[in-house]
């Protein structure tokens, strides 16, 4: 092949653009290893003596289907030097495969996130499980942050919030919180959580425990606060007097205060602190 000027010129051009992409295995048998840049694809190719009039032969293929590699080679071997064109087509195929693989991985991650086991948020599910423990002093397992109680026309509102990083921790947090007999005896325990999974998906849910639309409002609040990895429960002890829409103001106010104390929404907390300093 040393006397084949077209082949030698092609080798020099390839080496200048893609160094070491075409290396000899045996110069006597005119076999070379072709490596596709930025990929694991390698091909062992044998060149005929009358190349480029005759097409090279794919002996072995690694990282790509051999039949596909042969078909692509035959499509560009038209009587002129073809390794440049061959590499470009193979690289395009490799890039497409990589994009498809990435898309499939992302789709799989999304499916796994969508398959998260739903959390049973209703109070009765937890309180009924631990009746004998309700008389014991509460020894919380989670780092709960509490809002200041808000009392309006004999109804009292108070929030508890803690950091959670999975739906399993949400379940554990609920079990932990309902060990507090005061919380367990509340007329309504509205809950919401918002988790950002490692792949960036948002996992969230809420329950209003009979206080219509309260859970969804709390969930919306967490989104507006850009809160991450947090669970919040607002308890209401009903005093017998209906207070109308004001209850939603107290629920959101309590939830916001407790969430800020967990540092789950640092940007919101900075804004609040800045506002307080400004008032002074």
UniProtKB/Swiss-Prot annotation:
One of its GO terms (molecular function) is protein sequestering activity. Coiled coil: none annotated. One of its GO terms (biological process) is regulation of translational initiation. One of its GO terms (cellular component) is nucleus. Its main location: cytoplasm. It holds the Pfam family UPF0029. Keywords: Actin-binding, Cytoplasm, Nucleus, Repressor, Stress response, Translation regulation. The keyword Cytoplasm applies. It comes from the Eukaryota. Residues 9-109 form the RWD domain. It is found in: Cytoplasm; Nucleus. Gene3D superfamilies: Impact, N-terminal domain, Ubiquitin Conjugating Enzyme. Translational regulator that ensures constant high levels of translation under amino acid starvation. Plays a role as a negative regulator of the gcn2 kinase activity; impairs gcn1-mediated gcn2 activation, and hence gcn2-mediated eIF-2-alpha phosphorylation in amino acid-starved cells and subsequent down-regulation of protein synthesis. In normal conditions, it resides in a actin complex and has no activity. Interacts (via N-terminus) with gcn1 (via C-terminus); this interaction reduces the gcn1-gcn20 complex formation and prevents the interaction of gcn1 with gcn2 protein kinase and gcn2 activation in amino acid-starved cells. Interacts (via C-terminus) with act1; this interaction occurs in a gcn1-independent manner. Interacts with rpl39; this interaction occurs in a gcn1-independent manner. Associates (via middle region) with ribosomes; this association occurs in a gcn1-independent manner and persists under amino acid starvation conditions. Belongs to the IMPACT family. This is Protein IMPACT homolog. The lineage of its organism: Eukaryota, Fungi, Dikarya, Ascomycota, Taphrinomycotina.
